[in-house]
């Protein structure tokens, strides 16, 4: 039942009203009915009735009336002085960096508009990590980082040297431009740029906390996830796209705080409209608790005196472009162009000075109004809350930026502007010192210093603060625990099924089974994982309140409050966010979880690449499984599904470790290696990307001594003898079998011998080669290091064929010890057909490997060129067909 609409206490009266309007419509027409309704609404507005209730848009006033405001628990004057120092230090941080003329950039206006909001939260709401839980998880708006640094400096957590090194990180002891855990691993928890990542990440972080609690893994009941956002940022699809998830999951541990300063980078967010109304309607419709913080305490008297309802009407009518302009002018302008619109509103301020009018504050700059909103959010149960805080961009910055379209880009300021800020916020800096752009500090024992630290101690300590590693020791499975996968498989299976079997091995391991988090974007049946539904259950905070259609089946669709699988529906970005929350739980919760997100490989890095990059920044640890991979392997799905480049995208992320295994035993070794590296003693900040296939074929036993090569990226699979020269053949994934077939043809039909290599990771081999070359360049007097691939291979001509773009295997060209290295790949758009036809079309099958190998030998003069031409004819290769890259 909605709080706004209690049960009808007088149905007879209600019926009378409804019948009356029906009669008017019937007898006098729609226009007359509309007129009467308008008059009723106007009269209701005078009486303070929320005339838009039920439409999702209420009057343009505070949600919490004055009489319901709680008493403010802090010392307002002390907090003002502390806040003024933080404001000042934030601006000094940017100005002092800008003086170095290094073109560093920086943003001042965003924090100035939200400083009071953050200050109230730091003093009264943000709980730090403690012995019971990980504290509140705060997604700070990216552009306000100078303000957070300024507070940490006052707290003694950052030094003046660090502030002076804002955006200067190369030589150490600097501060990152925005929240970046990679760059400040003990400070920032969550990267929130690019914009849009914060809100959707916060939703799934809140969901994951509920998941941990419902599964009995950790008590997260006192934790709140706060996401601080900009109204301009809300245009990002990621910002609003998942808000209904918060309602579905009953995320009352989630609070969005949208700083509605009405401006984005270039100008107004909605100059001709009202962004707060727009957001209110969206969130109200999505089932959130909406709290508007529109006007500060100085408006309370005027609203009490507004017996005509004209002031509220005026507030409702005024568009954002005007509200922005008002705060870039002065009190006289506001008197004329706002209050002067109606005689009733002009009369309200007739005896006010222009200065009094100018001092009318917006809600986002009033600690009392802000505190009331956050306390109400804290008390709300069963639904997420959004706080819409009306603010001014560049608040207090005067002519330099306040309410101006240029505010976001302001990073320099003349001394008149600096003096204005000093005077505006009563900052204790003398005229003699102001040219030095000094920072403000509070001596130990001062009122401000004592209060600042006392408030944080009440809330368990300081934040942001990040825990780089988890403290417990996990008992991980040994490679022998995956023994069944290391042996020859009795039936043909795919590497995807090999992954599922490896997952089942871990689910039987008492030490880590509860830490596994299988994540699916509505494709479990595609990947053969439906057997897990009944085995470990699908997480649902509501349990299962219905009888599933397939209840009589062994693998029925079982939802459970304690379910282990996160089934995110057709929502790759949401599934990715759940994976990221689980993959960073080792830090946020000191509770290492082991997530496996399996998906169509085409819809991974290509679809959610920005999130994958952020995962690297956030130091995620977990497994991404790119199922149905390979341009020609997912054969029937066509152009948009067939992945031939996810490994190109994954290699752009420095701490993403990528593999393209061909055999079940390779999958087992790689997964075991990932467990050891991420969750073993080293606790490496990497995550694994493993592509798996939907093609069934024979899986041999692991050759003796192959383990090291599987981990490092290459090992020799077999040698086939020949009498007329020798080549080296490299393959990965599904195409490795075609490479092996080519080796047989070369030996049988042409007498050419081959060394055949399984390349599990061209990317890791390339990185190893680059590392060796760098070391050798910088250590000219030392014995040169040799790339691993050069240690394994020899100088015979080499041919590589994969189900990915040529660039994938081209990565290692420099490090291959052979002078002749030919790469085959699947450049071009995919299409639907049989695997056989597709592999021939993309020129990666056995016939093309044979022709390429013969061609390399012919270049060396070891065989006649006619042999190559005859092979082309033998395999029915159309030498003049369109290049598949262009086809």
Swiss-Prot record:
Per its record, the protein catalyses: N(6)-[(R)-lipoyl]-L-lysyl-[protein] + pyruvate + H(+) = N(6)-[(R)-S(8)-acetyldihydrolipoyl]-L-lysyl-[protein] + CO2
Q: Which GO terms describe its molecular function?
A: identical protein binding; magnesium ion binding; molecular adaptor activity; protein homodimerization activity; pyruvate dehydrogenase (acetyl-transferring) activity; pyruvate dehydrogenase activity; small molecule binding; thiamine pyrophosphate binding
Residues annotated with N6-acetyllysine modification: 716
Q: Give residues annotated as binding Mg(2+).
A: 231, 261, 263
Q: Which domain of life is it from?
A: Bacteria
The record's SUPFAM superfamilies line, in alphabetical order, gives: Thiamin diphosphate-binding fold (THDP-binding) (SSF52518), TK C-terminal domain-like (SSF52922)
A GO CC annotation recorded here is:
cytosol
Q: What is its EC number?
A: 1.2.4.1
UniProt keyword annotations, A-Z: Acetylation, Magnesium, Metal-binding, Oxidoreductase, Pyruvate, Thiamine pyrophosphate
| BP terms from Gene Ontology | pyruvate catabolic process
Q: Can the keyword Metal-binding be found in this entry's annotation?
A: yes
Signal peptide annotation = none
Cofactors: Mg(2+); thiamine diphosphate
Q: Which PANTHER family match?
A: PYRUVATE DEHYDROGENASE E1 COMPONENT (PTHR43825:SF3)
Subunit field text: Homodimer. Part of the PDH complex, consisting of multiple copies of pyruvate dehydrogenase (E1), dihydrolipoamide acetyltransferase (E2) and lipoamide dehydrogenase (E3). In pull-down experiments interacts with CedA.
Q: What does this protein do?
A: Component of the pyruvate dehydrogenase (PDH) complex, that catalyzes the overall conversion of pyruvate to acetyl-CoA and CO(2).
- Name of the protein this chain belongs to: Pyruvate dehydrogenase E1 component
Record the organism. Answer: Escherichia coli (strain K12)
Give the lineage.
Answer: Bacteria, Pseudomonadati, Pseudomonadota, Gammaproteobacteria, Enterobacterales
